[in-house]
């Protein structure tokens, strides 16, 4: 459970997510792990990056920066005495990162254009998303990451971290996200409605059709999921970043 940002976390959100998944027959095979309970692990990971001189302090105001960090603070030493009051950025080691996504094919990101040094510890001392998810996946032995295409641009940053931790990266597989009538991804930030847990079977069938899959004539979530696994055809999933329902 990604709960590393207390200022933005809504009360009851963690339990609601688990209840929504459970209503659709989706339950974890193992006890749920919460990132908020793994802070010490992430600081160990951060120390490993420090030992390799792969991070540096940065106090650049986020609102004034272009989308991809241009490296204003790159020459700062990790031993700078102001280190604990600034954010920490990871120093990317490659001018270009190329990766073959298992579904969308080869993608490339170039330093300065679609790539820049990224935050691994925020100014408020909170651990950043990229570092936490990579370290989680390494410690949990994750070999395949299947996620929405809105996260595909996180891939080069995560590949850099896997390299820094001397670990083979997982296979990445990105599927299209659901877009609203305005062409924007449905999300809580855009005011999208929450999942209706009173119609789980219909929701699952709709999701399968969205992904180009067949859906069985059943009202039981267990049967729908079992059929979906058996009949899964990854080649039928649209090779798109997003599409409307």
Residue map of PLM features:
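Short alpha-helical "patches" and their helix-cap loops
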Residues: 1-10, 174-176, 217-227, 244
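Active-site cores that bind ATP or allylic diphosphates and position pyrophosphate for catalysis
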Residues: 57-197, 215, 245
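N-terminal Rossmann-like or analogous alpha/beta NTP/dinucleotide-binding catalytic cores
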Residues: 1-70, 150, 154-167, 222-223
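Short alpha-helical interface elements
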Residues: 14, 24, 42-46, 156-159, ...
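Non-catalytic terminal extensions that flank enzyme cores
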Residues: 93-95, 184-245
């Amino acid at each position: 459970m990604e709960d590393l940002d207390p200022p933005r976390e809504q009360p009851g959100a963690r339990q609601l997510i688990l209840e929504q998944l459970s209503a659709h027959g989706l339950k974890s095979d193992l006890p749920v792990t919460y990132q908020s309970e793994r802070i010490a692990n992430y600081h160990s990971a951060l120390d490993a990056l420090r030992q390799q001189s792969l991070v540096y302090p940065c106090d650049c105001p986020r609102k004034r920066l272009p989308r991809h960090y241009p490296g204003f603070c790159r020459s700062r030493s990790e031993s700078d005495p102001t280190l604990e009051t600034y954010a920490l950025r990871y120093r990317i080691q490659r001018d270009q990162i190329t990766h073959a996504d298992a579904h969308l094919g080869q993608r490339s990101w170039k330093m300065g254009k679609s790539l820049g040094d990224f935050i691994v510890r925020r100014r408020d001392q909170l651990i950043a998303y990229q570092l936490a998810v990579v370290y989680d996946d390494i410690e949990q032995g994750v070999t395949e990451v299947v996620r929405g295409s809105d996260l595909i641009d996180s891939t080069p940053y995560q590949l850099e971290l896997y390299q820094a931790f001397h670990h083979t990266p997982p296979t990445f597989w990105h599927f299209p996200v659901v877009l609203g009538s305005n062409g924007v991804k449905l999300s809580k930030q855009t005011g999208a409605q929450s999942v209706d847990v009173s119609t789980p079977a219909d929701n699952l069938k709709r999701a399968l059709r969205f992904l180009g899959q067949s859906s069985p004539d059943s009202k039981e979530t267990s049967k729908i999921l079992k059929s979906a696994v058996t009949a899964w055809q990854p080649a039928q999933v649209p090779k798109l970043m997003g599409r409307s329902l």
